[in-house]
A protein has these predicted regions:
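C-terminal lobe/tail of nucleotide-utilizing enzymes
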Residues: 2-5, 177-241
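N-terminal phosphate/diphosphate-binding loop that engages ATP/GTP or pyrophosphate donors
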Residues: 4-8, 24-104, 108, 113-117
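Inter-motif core of Ras-like GTPase G domains
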Residues: 140-165
Length: 241
């Protein structure tokens, strides 16, 4: 699996859009792994929408991941790039830079943090993206546009796609799956996350995606009260875990 330590497995969790349940699934996924006595660490390299704390800028999603890991990690290890404004990260970084802050949102910085987590020698490393699959990181030193998906491709990570079940999700899911494969990556599985139980033809849409995505359906998540319940609805065996 690319540059991974020999005793580690890493998965990149992406979504068909923002606010489709990536963090909810990722936290539940970590806790399901912990329940199987697997050691876990998590990485959310980029987070926008952070609050100022006594320990610096912190993001609620990254904090939830930190609490779900079986190995204790400092906040900065999980989320090295914490941006204040809840907007597209590359725009938030540009605005922060214009305000006099130093923001390094390069692929190299993201890969550095990833390498440090590999040194923890966890059984499984869960990386959660921000927004959707093709998240812009802004221009690099050579004026080239970088994307978070470039980091995933560089590390050859297996991808888990969280599909937010709502009108339009078929197109979003298929476009995302196509792009993942165009990067030469494996779509290890996908999760149907029920955003609206009253969605017309919910089950028919899930059945359609099963035929269209050509990847294992890891589980169908109803609306749940807690990520602790996720493990009751997902099949880890499909991931070889």
């Amino acid at each position: 699996m690319g540059n991974l330590a020999t005793n580690s497995r890493a998965f990149f969790v992406t979504g068909t859009d923002t606010e489709v349940g990536k963090t909810f699934f990722s936290v539940g996924f970590l806790r399901a792994l912990n329940a199987k006595d697997l050691t876990t660490v998590a990485y959310k390299p980029v987070a926008a929408g952070c609050s100022q704390t006594s320990k610096g800028w912190q993001n609620d999603d990254a904090l939830a991941l930190q609490q779900a890991c079986s190995i204790n990690l400092a906040y900065d290890e999980i989320n090295p790039i914490a941006l204040a404004e809840p907007i597209a990260p590359h725009i938030a970084a540009k605005r922060a830079t214009e305000a006099g802050l130093t923001i390094d949102m390069s692929i190299q910085r993201i890969e550095q943090g990833f390498s440090q987590l590999l040194q923890k020698q966890a059984d499984v490393l869960v990386v959660e993206g921000a927004g959707g699959w093709r998240l812009p990181l802004g221009l690099d030193a050579d004026g080239q546009q970088g994307f978070l998906s470039d980091f995933v491709a560089n590390q050859n990570l297996a991808v888990i796609l969280v599909v937010g079940m709502r009108l339009g999700c078929l197109n979003h899911a298929m476009l995302t799956a196509d792009s993942i494969r165009q990067h030469g990556l494996k779509l290890a599985g996908w999760v149907a996350n029920t955003l609206d139980p009253a969605m017309p033809c919910l089950h028919e849409n899930i059945e359609s995606l099963q035929g269209l995505l050509n990847a294992p359906l890891l589980g169908v998540l109803p609306q749940l009260a807690s990520p602790n319940e996720v493990q009751d609805y997902i099949d880890l065996a499909s991931l070889g875990l």
